[in-house]
Protein backbone atom coordinates (compact mmCIF):
# COMPACT_ATOMS: atom_id res chain seq x y z
CA UNK A 1 0.00 0.00 0.00
CA UNK A 2 1.27 3.47 -0.83
CA UNK A 3 2.25 5.69 2.07
CA UNK A 4 -0.53 7.96 3.35
CA UNK A 5 0.02 11.68 2.64
CA UNK A 6 -0.33 12.47 6.36
CA UNK A 7 1.50 15.80 6.01
CA UNK A 8 -1.22 16.95 3.57
CA UNK A 9 -4.12 15.96 5.84
CA UNK A 10 -4.89 19.46 7.18
CA UNK A 11 -4.83 20.98 3.68
CA UNK A 12 -7.10 18.23 2.31
CA UNK A 13 -9.57 18.77 5.16
CA UNK A 14 -9.50 22.56 4.61
CA UNK A 15 -10.33 21.90 0.94
CA UNK A 16 -13.39 19.85 1.94
CA UNK A 17 -14.40 22.59 4.37
CA UNK A 18 -14.26 25.21 1.57
CA UNK A 19 -16.23 22.96 -0.79
CA UNK A 20 -19.00 22.23 1.73
CA UNK A 21 -19.13 25.88 2.85
CA UNK A 22 -19.67 26.90 -0.80
CA UNK A 23 -22.38 24.25 -1.31
CA UNK A 24 -24.27 25.40 1.81
CA UNK A 25 -23.81 29.16 1.18
CA UNK A 26 -27.09 29.57 -0.82
CA UNK A 27 -28.97 28.30 2.26
CA UNK A 28 -27.53 30.91 4.68
CA UNK A 29 -25.66 28.27 6.63
CA UNK A 30 -23.66 29.39 9.69
CA UNK A 31 -19.91 28.56 9.72
CA UNK A 32 -19.21 24.82 9.80
CA UNK A 33 -18.22 22.87 12.89
CA UNK A 34 -15.35 20.76 11.51
CA UNK A 35 -14.45 17.38 13.01
CA UNK A 36 -11.12 15.91 11.90
CA UNK A 37 -10.24 12.22 11.78
CA UNK A 38 -7.19 10.37 13.02
CA UNK A 39 -4.66 10.57 10.18
CA UNK A 40 -4.05 6.80 10.03
CA UNK A 41 -5.60 3.54 11.31
CA UNK A 42 -9.06 5.15 11.42
CA UNK A 43 -11.10 2.66 9.40
CA UNK A 44 -12.70 -0.16 11.40
CA UNK A 45 -13.52 -2.40 8.46
CA UNK A 46 -11.82 -3.46 5.24
CA UNK A 47 -12.46 -5.88 2.37
CA UNK A 48 -9.76 -7.41 0.18
CA UNK A 49 -9.76 -9.70 -2.82
CA UNK A 50 -7.35 -12.62 -2.58
CA UNK A 51 -4.92 -13.25 -5.45
CA UNK A 52 -3.51 -16.77 -5.91
CA UNK A 53 -0.10 -17.08 -7.59
CA UNK A 54 1.42 -20.59 -7.79
CA UNK A 55 1.78 -21.68 -4.13
CA UNK A 56 1.36 -18.17 -2.75
CA UNK A 57 -1.63 -15.91 -2.20
CA UNK A 58 -2.07 -12.40 -0.81
CA UNK A 59 -4.51 -9.52 -0.29
CA UNK A 60 -5.07 -7.25 -3.28
CA UNK A 61 -7.08 -4.16 -4.17
CA UNK A 62 -7.84 -2.58 -7.53
CA UNK A 63 -6.86 0.96 -8.47
CA UNK A 64 -10.18 2.77 -9.07
CA UNK A 65 -8.81 4.71 -12.06
CA UNK A 66 -6.54 2.22 -13.85
CA UNK A 67 -8.32 -0.97 -12.60
CA UNK A 68 -4.81 -2.41 -12.04
CA UNK A 69 -4.51 -4.77 -9.09
CA UNK A 70 -1.92 -4.11 -6.41
CA UNK A 71 -0.70 -6.22 -3.53
CA UNK A 72 -1.58 -5.20 0.03
CA UNK A 73 0.45 -6.50 2.97
CA UNK A 74 -0.31 -3.60 5.32
CA UNK A 75 -3.18 -1.13 5.06
CA UNK A 76 -2.48 2.07 7.03
CA UNK A 77 -6.03 3.45 6.79
CA UNK A 78 -7.38 0.32 8.56
CA UNK A 79 -7.30 -0.13 12.33
CA UNK A 80 -4.15 -1.43 14.00
CA UNK A 81 -6.11 -4.58 14.86
CA UNK A 82 -6.95 -5.28 11.19
CA UNK A 83 -3.27 -4.82 10.25
CA UNK A 84 -2.17 -7.19 13.02
CA UNK A 85 -4.75 -9.75 11.89
CA UNK A 86 -3.69 -9.47 8.21
CA UNK A 87 -0.11 -10.34 9.19
CA UNK A 88 -1.14 -13.21 11.49
CA UNK A 89 -3.88 -14.74 9.34
CA UNK A 90 -2.22 -15.51 5.99
CA UNK A 91 0.63 -17.72 7.31
CA UNK A 92 -1.94 -19.70 9.35
CA UNK A 93 -4.30 -20.09 6.38
CA UNK A 94 -1.39 -21.49 4.34
CA UNK A 95 -1.20 -24.43 6.79
CA UNK A 96 -4.68 -25.60 5.69
CA UNK A 97 -5.25 -26.30 1.98
CA UNK A 98 -8.98 -26.63 2.54
CA UNK A 99 -9.09 -23.03 3.86
CA UNK A 100 -7.21 -21.51 0.92
CA UNK A 101 -8.71 -23.51 -1.95
CA UNK A 102 -11.05 -21.21 -3.97
CA UNK A 103 -10.82 -18.47 -1.31
CA UNK A 104 -11.44 -15.21 -3.20
CA UNK A 105 -12.07 -12.52 -0.57
CA UNK A 106 -11.44 -11.70 3.10
CA UNK A 107 -13.51 -9.11 4.99
CA UNK A 108 -12.46 -7.66 8.35
CA UNK A 109 -14.65 -5.86 10.89
CA UNK A 110 -12.86 -4.57 14.01
CA UNK A 111 -13.89 -2.55 17.06
CA UNK A 112 -12.36 -0.07 19.50
CA UNK A 113 -13.16 -2.74 22.13
CA UNK A 114 -10.49 -4.91 20.45
CA UNK A 115 -12.74 -7.54 18.89
CA UNK A 116 -12.60 -8.61 15.24
CA UNK A 117 -14.63 -10.62 12.73
CA UNK A 118 -12.84 -12.32 9.84
CA UNK A 119 -15.11 -13.44 6.98
CA UNK A 120 -13.65 -15.87 4.45
CA UNK A 121 -15.50 -15.89 1.09
CA UNK A 122 -15.31 -18.89 -1.26
CA UNK A 123 -16.26 -20.05 -4.76
CA UNK A 124 -17.08 -23.55 -3.43
CA UNK A 125 -19.40 -25.34 -1.00
CA UNK A 126 -18.11 -25.43 2.58
CA UNK A 127 -18.14 -28.86 4.25
CA UNK A 128 -17.35 -30.53 7.58
CA UNK A 129 -13.63 -30.69 6.71
CA UNK A 130 -13.64 -26.88 6.17
CA UNK A 131 -15.37 -26.40 9.52
CA UNK A 132 -12.75 -28.49 11.36
CA UNK A 133 -9.87 -26.56 9.75
CA UNK A 134 -11.56 -23.20 10.45
CA UNK A 135 -12.06 -24.21 14.11
CA UNK A 136 -8.35 -25.03 14.33
CA UNK A 137 -7.51 -21.66 12.71
CA UNK A 138 -9.66 -19.83 15.24
CA UNK A 139 -7.91 -21.59 18.14
CA UNK A 140 -4.49 -20.68 16.70
CA UNK A 141 -5.54 -17.01 16.47
CA UNK A 142 -6.93 -17.02 20.03
CA UNK A 143 -3.56 -18.41 21.22
CA UNK A 144 -1.93 -15.37 19.59
CA UNK A 145 -4.17 -13.10 21.69
CA UNK A 146 -6.95 -12.24 19.22
CA UNK A 147 -10.60 -11.95 20.31
CA UNK A 148 -11.85 -13.22 16.94
CA UNK A 149 -14.96 -14.55 15.23
CA UNK A 150 -14.53 -16.58 12.02
CA UNK A 151 -17.27 -16.75 9.37
CA UNK A 152 -17.24 -18.76 6.15
CA UNK A 153 -19.37 -17.62 3.22
CA UNK A 154 -20.14 -19.31 -0.07
CA UNK A 155 -23.07 -19.27 -2.48
CA UNK A 156 -26.24 -19.55 -0.30
CA UNK A 157 -24.05 -20.62 2.63
CA UNK A 158 -22.94 -18.87 5.80
CA UNK A 159 -21.15 -20.75 8.58
CA UNK A 160 -20.48 -18.95 11.89
CA UNK A 161 -18.03 -20.70 14.19
CA UNK A 162 -19.67 -18.99 17.15
CA UNK A 163 -21.51 -15.77 16.27
CA UNK A 164 -21.77 -13.25 13.43
CA UNK A 165 -21.44 -10.10 15.52
CA UNK A 166 -19.06 -8.16 17.77
CA UNK A 167 -20.01 -5.77 20.56
CA UNK A 168 -18.41 -2.34 20.21
CA UNK A 169 -18.01 0.11 23.10
CA UNK A 170 -18.01 3.78 22.07
CA UNK A 171 -16.97 6.57 24.46
CA UNK A 172 -19.37 9.49 23.97
CA UNK A 173 -19.53 12.49 26.35
CA UNK A 174 -18.17 10.63 29.40
CA UNK A 175 -20.49 7.69 28.76
CA UNK A 176 -19.78 4.27 27.29
CA UNK A 177 -22.32 3.01 24.74
CA UNK A 178 -22.52 -0.65 23.72
CA UNK A 179 -23.33 -1.32 20.07
CA UNK A 180 -23.75 -4.80 18.59
CA UNK A 181 -22.28 -4.78 15.08
CA UNK A 182 -23.45 -7.56 12.77
CA UNK A 183 -21.21 -8.90 9.99
CA UNK A 184 -22.29 -7.73 6.54
CA UNK A 185 -24.59 -5.01 7.98
CA UNK A 186 -23.94 -1.28 7.86
CA UNK A 187 -21.84 0.24 10.65
CA UNK A 188 -20.09 3.62 10.69
CA UNK A 189 -16.56 2.82 9.38
CA UNK A 190 -14.64 5.52 11.29
CA UNK A 191 -15.35 4.89 14.99
CA UNK A 192 -13.66 7.98 16.45
CA UNK A 193 -15.42 10.31 13.99
CA UNK A 194 -18.68 8.47 14.72
CA UNK A 195 -18.21 9.39 18.41
CA UNK A 196 -17.80 13.05 17.35
CA UNK A 197 -20.97 12.82 15.23
CA UNK A 198 -22.91 11.46 18.20
CA UNK A 199 -21.58 14.22 20.47
CA UNK A 200 -22.52 16.91 17.92
CA UNK A 201 -26.04 15.43 17.58
CA UNK A 202 -26.45 15.32 21.38
CA UNK A 203 -25.34 18.98 21.63
CA UNK A 204 -27.78 20.06 18.90
CA UNK A 205 -30.76 18.38 20.55
CA UNK A 206 -30.06 19.15 24.22
CA UNK A 207 -32.92 20.96 26.03
CA UNK A 208 -35.39 19.45 23.53
CA UNK A 209 -39.05 19.26 24.46
CA UNK A 210 -41.27 16.38 23.31
CA UNK A 211 -40.35 13.28 21.33
CA UNK A 212 -37.96 12.24 18.54
CA UNK A 213 -38.70 10.32 15.36
CA UNK A 214 -35.77 8.71 13.51
CA UNK A 215 -35.99 7.28 9.98
CA UNK A 216 -33.35 4.71 8.82
CA UNK A 217 -32.01 3.99 12.35
CA UNK A 218 -29.69 1.05 11.48
CA UNK A 219 -28.42 -0.59 14.68
CA UNK A 220 -29.67 2.39 16.73
CA UNK A 221 -26.34 4.25 16.48
CA UNK A 222 -27.89 7.72 16.85
CA UNK A 223 -31.25 7.04 18.52
CA UNK A 224 -29.63 5.27 21.50
CA UNK A 225 -27.27 8.20 22.17
CA UNK A 226 -30.04 10.80 21.59
CA UNK A 227 -32.68 9.10 23.78
CA UNK A 228 -31.35 10.99 26.84
CA UNK A 229 -32.55 14.30 25.31
CA UNK A 230 -36.18 13.26 24.68
CA UNK A 231 -39.29 12.00 26.49
CA UNK A 232 -39.75 9.19 23.93
CA UNK A 233 -38.05 8.07 20.70
CA UNK A 234 -39.69 6.21 17.81
CA UNK A 235 -37.35 4.83 15.12
CA UNK A 236 -37.80 2.92 11.85
CA UNK A 237 -35.45 0.50 10.06
CA UNK A 238 -36.07 -1.97 7.22
CA UNK A 239 -33.11 -4.44 7.48
CA UNK A 240 -33.88 -7.38 9.79
CA UNK A 241 -30.30 -7.90 11.18
CA UNK A 242 -30.07 -4.17 11.99
CA UNK A 243 -33.43 -4.24 13.80
CA UNK A 244 -32.41 -7.20 15.99
CA UNK A 245 -29.01 -5.57 16.72
CA UNK A 246 -30.85 -2.34 17.63
CA UNK A 247 -33.15 -4.26 20.03
CA UNK A 248 -30.07 -5.77 21.72
CA UNK A 249 -28.41 -2.32 21.93
CA UNK A 250 -31.51 -0.78 23.55
CA UNK A 251 -31.43 -3.46 26.27
CA UNK A 252 -27.62 -3.39 26.70
CA UNK A 253 -27.64 0.40 27.21
CA UNK A 254 -30.70 0.24 29.52
CA UNK A 255 -32.70 2.63 27.31
CA UNK A 256 -36.39 2.53 28.26
CA UNK A 257 -37.87 5.27 26.07
CA UNK A 258 -36.95 4.03 22.56
CA UNK A 259 -39.18 1.90 20.32
CA UNK A 260 -38.04 0.53 16.93
CA UNK A 261 -40.40 -0.59 14.17
CA UNK A 262 -39.38 -2.57 11.10
CA UNK A 263 -40.74 -0.64 8.13
CA UNK A 264 -39.50 1.60 5.35
CA UNK A 265 -39.50 5.40 5.63
CA UNK A 266 -41.97 5.47 2.70
CA UNK A 267 -44.44 3.11 4.47
CA UNK A 268 -44.05 5.01 7.72
CA UNK A 269 -44.84 8.26 5.88
CA UNK A 270 -48.09 6.67 4.67
CA UNK A 271 -48.93 5.48 8.19
CA UNK A 272 -48.25 8.93 9.70
CA UNK A 273 -50.43 10.56 7.04
CA UNK A 274 -53.22 8.05 7.67
CA UNK A 275 -53.08 6.81 4.06
CA UNK A 276 -53.21 3.16 5.20
CA UNK A 277 -52.87 0.97 8.29
CA UNK A 278 -49.96 -1.45 8.84
CA UNK A 279 -49.97 -4.67 10.90
CA UNK A 280 -46.44 -3.83 12.06
CA UNK A 281 -47.82 -0.83 13.94
CA UNK A 282 -50.23 -2.95 16.00
CA UNK A 283 -49.81 -2.01 19.65
CA UNK A 284 -48.21 1.35 18.79
CA UNK A 285 -50.46 4.36 18.95
CA UNK A 286 -48.79 7.03 16.84
CA UNK A 287 -51.00 9.60 18.61
CA UNK A 288 -49.12 8.86 21.88
CA UNK A 289 -46.01 10.42 20.37
CA UNK A 290 -45.52 14.18 20.28
CA UNK A 291 -42.60 14.02 17.86
CA UNK A 292 -41.52 17.59 17.22
CA UNK A 293 -37.94 16.62 16.27
CA UNK A 294 -37.05 14.30 13.41
CA UNK A 295 -33.66 12.72 12.70
CA UNK A 296 -32.77 11.48 9.21
CA UNK A 297 -29.59 9.79 7.96
CA UNK A 298 -30.64 8.73 4.46
CA UNK A 299 -28.72 6.72 1.84
CA UNK A 300 -26.62 8.53 -0.78
CA UNK A 301 -29.73 9.24 -2.85
CA UNK A 302 -31.06 11.57 -0.12
CA UNK A 303 -34.71 11.88 0.91
CA UNK A 304 -37.47 11.27 -1.64
CA UNK A 305 -39.98 14.10 -2.08
CA UNK A 306 -42.73 12.43 0.02
CA UNK A 307 -40.31 12.07 2.95
CA UNK A 308 -39.11 15.69 2.51
CA UNK A 309 -42.76 16.77 2.84
CA UNK A 310 -43.16 14.59 5.96
CA UNK A 311 -39.95 15.98 7.48
CA UNK A 312 -41.14 19.58 6.96
CA UNK A 313 -44.01 18.99 9.40
CA UNK A 314 -41.53 18.84 12.29
CA UNK A 315 -40.35 21.77 14.37
CA UNK A 316 -36.71 20.63 14.30
CA UNK A 317 -34.81 18.48 11.80
CA UNK A 318 -31.44 16.82 12.37
CA UNK A 319 -30.11 15.64 8.99
CA UNK A 320 -26.89 13.62 8.67
CA UNK A 321 -25.80 13.23 5.05
CA UNK A 322 -23.23 11.05 3.28
CA UNK A 323 -23.74 12.99 0.03
CA UNK A 324 -23.65 16.82 0.17
CA UNK A 325 -25.14 17.11 -3.33
CA UNK A 326 -28.38 15.28 -2.48
CA UNK A 327 -28.40 17.13 0.87
CA UNK A 328 -28.41 20.42 -1.07
CA UNK A 329 -31.23 19.16 -3.32
CA UNK A 330 -33.26 18.42 -0.18
CA UNK A 331 -32.31 21.77 1.38
CA UNK A 332 -33.85 23.62 -1.57
CA UNK A 333 -37.21 22.41 -0.24
CA UNK A 334 -36.42 22.22 3.48
CA UNK A 335 -35.14 25.81 3.71
CA UNK A 336 -38.51 27.09 2.45
CA UNK A 337 -39.89 26.16 5.88
CA UNK A 338 -36.77 25.83 8.07
CA UNK A 339 -33.50 27.69 8.67
CA UNK A 340 -30.09 26.10 9.29
CA UNK A 341 -29.12 26.66 12.91
CA UNK A 342 -25.91 24.57 12.85
CA UNK A 343 -23.88 22.75 10.19
CA UNK A 344 -20.97 20.34 10.47
CA UNK A 345 -18.38 18.49 8.42
CA UNK A 346 -17.30 15.08 9.72
CA UNK A 347 -14.18 13.68 8.05
CA UNK A 348 -15.26 10.03 8.06
CA UNK A 349 -13.16 9.23 4.98
CA UNK A 350 -9.79 11.06 4.98
CA UNK A 351 -7.79 11.27 1.73
CA UNK A 352 -10.97 10.82 -0.37
CA UNK A 353 -13.48 13.23 -1.93
CA UNK A 354 -16.17 11.88 0.38
CA UNK A 355 -17.85 14.38 2.75
CA UNK A 356 -20.10 13.41 5.66
CA UNK A 357 -22.07 16.38 6.90
CA UNK A 358 -24.82 17.36 9.31
CA UNK A 359 -27.36 20.18 9.47
CA UNK A 360 -29.63 21.17 12.37
CA UNK A 361 -32.73 22.95 11.08
CA UNK A 362 -35.35 24.93 13.04
CA UNK A 363 -38.79 25.86 11.69
CA UNK A 364 -39.05 29.50 10.61
CA UNK A 365 -41.54 31.58 12.59
CA UNK A 366 -44.31 32.87 10.32
Swiss-Prot record:
One of its GO terms (molecular function) is tRNA (uracil(54)-C5)-methyltransferase activity, S-adenosyl methionine-dependent. HAMAP family: RNA_methyltr_TrmA. CDD domains: AdoMet_MTases. Keywords: Methyltransferase, S-adenosyl-L-methionine, Transferase, tRNA processing. Dual-specificity methyltransferase that catalyzes the formation of 5-methyluridine at position 54 (m5U54) in all tRNAs, and that of position 341 (m5U341) in tmRNA (transfer-mRNA). This is tRNA/tmRNA (uracil-C(5))-methyltransferase. One of its GO terms (cellular component) is cytosol. InterPro entries: MeTrfase_TrmA_AS, MeTrfase_TrmA_CS, SAM-dependent_MTases_sf, TrmA_MeTrfase, U5_MeTrfase_fam. Pfam families: tRNA_U5-meth_tr (PF05958). The keyword tRNA processing applies. The gene is trmA. GO terms for biological process: tRNA methylation.
